[in-house]
Structures are given as C-alpha cells and as structure tokens.
Amino acid sequence: MSEMTYKDAGVDIDKEAFAVRAIRDVLEKYKVEPEGCREVEGIGHYAAVLEVHGELLTLNVDGVGSKVLVAQLVGRYDTVGIDAIAMNANDAVCLGARPLAFLDYLAMEDPDPDVCAEIAEGLGKGAREAGAPIVGGELATLPEVIRGKEEGRGFDLVVACLGRVEGDPITGEDVEPGDAIVGLRSSGIHSNGLTLARKVLLSEYDVHDELPHGRTVAEELLEPTRIYVRPVMEVLRDYEVRGIAHITGGGVENLKRLRDDVRYVLDDPFEPHPVFEIIRELGNVPVEEMYRTFNMGMGMALIVPEEEAEDVVDTVSKHVEAKIVGHVEEGRGVVVHMDGHEVKL
C-alpha cells in the first residue's frame, strides 16, 4: 500500500480546526451571560466551565465517530456506549471535574429495540464506571439522514456530560518547564483514528480475521475506551496537578492544548499496542502521522511537579498502568523519542 495518512482516509484534522474556528467566531457575536452564570472557560478546551451561583460546573459533548460503523459490520452494539461515556467523562476530568450526570442522543436509521438495548447496556456500564447516572436523552428515527454499513443498522451516538469542579479548574496554564509527564496506559485505539485504522486493516483483513498478535480486527477496533475518572480523582485529592490531557483526536499533540509555549518531551513513552504497529506497516503510515492520529498507548497524561511524579504513578497504578513518560522544558511543540528515532510534532 502507498503511504497513507488520516487525510487520505477522509479526515482532515487541520480543516476541522479551521471549521471549529469559524463556528467559534460566529458564536462570539451572539454570546449572552444569564444572571448568576459566568463563563470561566469556553470553546477550545476539553469542556466549558461555568460559574453558576458560586458553583463551578463543566459541560461537554462528544460522540464515538466511525466506531459505530465497526459495530454495524460486526453486529455487536454493547461496547460503543462505553466509548461515548468515556469520551465525555475523560474530557470532563481534564478540567478537574467529577462527572455528575450524562445525557445521550441516539439517531437511528431504524429503531430496532434489540439494538437499542445493546447500546444502552454499554451506556449503563460506562456511566457506572464513571460514577454518574444517565438522566435523560433523545432517540431520533432519521432514515433519510442516517445510512448504515448494513441496511437498517445505521446509527450515531452522542453523549453530553455535566460535571462539577471543587477548587480551581485545571486549565494547563500552570504547567511549567521542569514538570513531569505521567502517562496513563490506553486500552487500545480508543475512539479516535478509527477511520484510518478501519480502512487500513480492512484493506487486508476481514473484520473477523485474527491479527498476528492473536486478537481479531473486530476485537481491536471495538475495544472500549478506558475511563480514567477514578484514578484522576484520587490523584487530584492528594497531589498538585497542573495539566491533564486526554489523548484523543490529534494524538499526543493534545498536550499543546494545555500550554502551547512550552515543549513536551516524551523520552520514555509507552510501547504502542501491537495493533498500532500493524496499522503503521500495513498502511505505510509515517510515524509522525501515527503520533498525531492515535494515542499510541497513552490515553491520558497528567502534568505534575517533578518531585510528586513517583507518588502520582503509585496512586494511579492502583487502577491502571502508569509511568513517567517525559517532562516539560523550554521551547515549543511535542517531541517523542521512540526506538532511537525522534518525532517532532
């Protein structure tokens, strides 16, 4: 296969950034501030932060992207709900917020009760792991809008999250050179880069085929996104955390969402999961593209004072694999050292 990028697969993240900027610029003209409600952090971060009568609340919304297509191909629907909750819960904790409640929006080509029940199973499991209930939602039947890989099976799934911050929100502005970067291991691909992963893997394998490392394509593509609420909340209780990055769309470049005037050096990153190397080799995907598309083994990063880093690792490791993956220094961008190679982003 000739060299393939996320853009070649149909997703242009640079174009997306311009589109978001266009939306944000228009919405700025219509901004209102209700009595008793003040915007503390707005469009651009992982979640908005609102001060409502003295309480700091967060709001965010996200979906699971083209992972729904894999669910349709496989005929398995009980995992994508976990992803939908995870994407939102993990974004909320990046501001230091504990999720309070979720809403879901399910748009379907045909509202099959059995499929809906499977999707709800995943939503329920995810919400329980995140420690907050699903308090409402919307089911829309849109046969002219939603088209599936399998006739009648098309759907899209979106979740919104309400959270609460105790103390000051964590925006990343306190990150400084000398800080340590603690990485939290991902469970796999999670919910970003699925379009590229799916197109590369399915160019060579059937969705039920076994990959060289023993897992099937379906298992890798549908592996649920890990939910990091519990370990992060425990760390926030006992240690100073200066920035939290959910490694989603854009890969490790998400670190730059915290402060973009410092350099994040990953000199001891996690070994990527085997599926990432298969995608890279099979799709002839440049290493730089891999790190700006996928999480490459790290689902979340905590920026903490260097002297607290080992204790933070010990705390997180009670829940999920963690280690010090790098540090912050003077400069700009993200640098990854992997197998003797240096990747600059």
Curated annotation (Swiss-Prot):
InterPro entries: PurM-like_C_dom, PurM-like_C_sf, PurM-like_N, PurM-like_N_sf, PurM_cligase. Keywords: ATP-binding, Cytoplasm, Ligase, Nucleotide-binding, Purine biosynthesis. SUPFAM superfamilies: PurM C-terminal domain-like, PurM N-terminal domain-like. GO terms for molecular function: ATP binding; phosphoribosylamine-glycine ligase activity; phosphoribosylformylglycinamidine cyclo-ligase activity. It is found in: Cytoplasm. Its EC number is 6.3.3.1. GO terms for biological process: 'de novo' IMP biosynthetic process; adenine biosynthetic process. The keyword Transport does not apply. GO terms for cellular component: cytosol. It catalyses: 2-formamido-N(1)-(5-O-phospho-beta-D-ribosyl)acetamidine + ATP = 5-amino-1-(5-phospho-beta-D-ribosyl)imidazole + ADP + phosphate + H(+). It comes from the Archaea. Pathway: Purine metabolism; IMP biosynthesis via de novo pathway; 5-amino-1-(5-phospho-D-ribosyl)imidazole from N(2)-formyl-N(1)-(5-phospho-D-ribosyl)glycinamide: step 2/2. It holds the Pfam family AIRS. NCBIfam families: purM. Belongs to the AIR synthase family. This is Phosphoribosylformylglycinamidine cyclo-ligase. It comes from Methanopyrus kandleri (strain AV19 / DSM 6324 / JCM 9639 / NBRC 100938).
